[in-house]
């Protein structure tokens, strides 16, 4: 795979180019990295960190015959319609025709159908991967998405040709984030009939908690205003949120030793509920030192730390 100068990577839904970060940390040289992303701020972050990135624009506009011979193909297609927040509707047109195959999607696209949500873009990932496989049958791929209903998980697995691996990012970070990963990396023949199976093991739990990643000295532009603190106090139980005068106090490692000291109250101002037909907002408590999954739908989430004898209010840093 690749040559002495490195591999060629195409990454769809590239975001801030975590794929490049992972390859860099793994010590894998990259000759060319082509990225498909439309968010201007994500692109700015990528180009600041990896100025040699070749930006391709929207995934729907990629002409596969213009792509170079590709060694690795990455993607994390939108998950909203697969998640509870999206009522697990899956992939469909605006008039509720379910899209179960790539051929069907390409027909609908040619006829200029309007699609529901953004999760249908999985089929754009498959369109590109299908063409890249024709040029390089040994191409390595990786697709990430949310844990979804078994129906849609089966459809994605059938299309891509492998079953997913479920990994919770809590094993290697301070955030609970269960995700599915479809990949042909680390596959070996196994079982009675010699079918290829993944040999990728679950990551070792690094025992990283929120207290381990919070910053002690934070720029004043990230402080909560008195108005914001007052609003939060009105929204949740007063005994769980304590206002401070100007900024959050430093959280030392010793705070986790008492019962309430490691209780992070996560106040989400966006509708959130385990029941898809009900919204609602308010404090969601955890006592394991981890955050709830904070994704693009949680940009208004505010994390409150309730500590016996000390008072602090924290907000997540936006980047």
Residue spans of the language-model regions?
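Conserved active-site and SAM-binding loop architecture
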Residues: 1-319
């Amino acid at each position: 795979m690749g040559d002495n100068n490195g591999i060629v990577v195409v990454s769809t839904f590239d975001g801030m180019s975590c794929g490049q970060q992972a390859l860099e940390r793994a010590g894998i040289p990259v000759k060319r990295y082509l990225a498909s992303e439309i968010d201007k701020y994500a692109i700015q972050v990528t180009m600041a960190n990896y100025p040699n990135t070749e930006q391709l624009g929207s995934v729907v506009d990629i002409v596969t015959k213009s792509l170079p011979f590709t060694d690795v193909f990455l993607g994390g297609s939108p998950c909203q319609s697969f998640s509870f927040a999206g009522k697990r509707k899956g992939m469909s047109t605006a008039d509720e025709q379910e899209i179960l195959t790539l051929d069907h999607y390409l027909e609908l696209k040619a006829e200029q159908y309007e699609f529901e949500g953004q999760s249908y873009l999985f089929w754009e990932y498959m369109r590109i991967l299908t063409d890249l496989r024709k040029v390089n049958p040994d191409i390595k791929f990786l697709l990430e998405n949310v844990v979804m209903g078994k129906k849609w998980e089966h459809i994605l697995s059938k299309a891509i040709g492998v079953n997913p691996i479920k990994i919770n990012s809590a094993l290697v970070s301070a955030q609970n984030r269960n995700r599915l990963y479809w990949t042909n990396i680390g596959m070996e023949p196994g079982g009675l009939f010699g079918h290829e199976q993944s040999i990728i093991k679950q990551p070792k739990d690094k025992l990283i908690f929120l207290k381990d990643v919070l910053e002690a000295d934070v720029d004043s532009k990230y402080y909560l205003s008195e108005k914001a603190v007052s609003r939060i106090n009105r929204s949740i139980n007063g005994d769980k949120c304590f206002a401070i005068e100007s900024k959050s106090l430093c959280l030392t490692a010793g705070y986790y030793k008492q019962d309430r000291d490691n209780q992070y109250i996560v106040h989400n101002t966006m509708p959130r509920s385990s029941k898809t037909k009900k919204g609602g907002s308010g404090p969601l408590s955890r006592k394991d030192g981890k955050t709830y999954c904070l994704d693009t739908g949680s940009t208004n989430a505010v994390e409150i730390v309730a500590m016996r004898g000390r008072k602090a209010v924290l907000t997540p840093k936006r980047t």
